Amino acid sequence: MSEQKIRIRLKAFDHRLIDRSASEIVETAKRTGAQVRGPIPLPTKIERYTILVSPHADKDARDQYETRTHKRVLDIVDPNDKTVDALMKLELAAGVDVQIKLT
């Protein structure tokens, strides 16, 4: 039988928030006896927006904004029931998007 694995993908706009959440997940998984791979940083997605400031003329007057989406991947190898229960009870920050896939 192949080993079971939980893959957790984290997304957030603030890198400090995502790193703190990843360390909480790693700490919780290690405390229950599971082996953890990661957190692996994925490329940061940068979206830039250019907006004209002037309502009529002046194409030279523009503001530029950007959003950075930081991503991390964690693999929990061979988790047990205690690991799954502890991860379900874990409360992370509100600005972190968590996707969990069981393979």
From Swiss-Prot:
SMART domains, alphabetized: Ribosomal_S10
Single GO MF descriptor: tRNA binding
Keywords associated with the record: Ribonucleoprotein, Ribosomal protein
Gene Ontology CC, one term: ribosome
InterPro entries reported for this sequence: Ribosomal_uS10, Ribosomal_uS10_CS, Ribosomal_uS10_dom, Ribosomal_uS10_dom_sf
The keyword Ribonucleoprotein appears for this protein: yes
Cystine crosslinks: none
GO terms for biological process, alphabetical: translation
Keyword Ribonucleoprotein carried by entry: yes
HAMAP family: Ribosomal_uS10
Function noted in UniProt: Involved in the binding of tRNA to the ribosomes.
PANTHER family: 30S RIBOSOMAL PROTEIN S10 FAMILY MEMBER
Assembly description: Part of the 30S ribosomal subunit.
Family, per entry: Belongs to the universal ribosomal protein uS10 family.
Name of the featured protein: Small ribosomal subunit protein uS10
Organism from which the protein derives: Xanthomonas axonopodis pv. citri (strain 306)
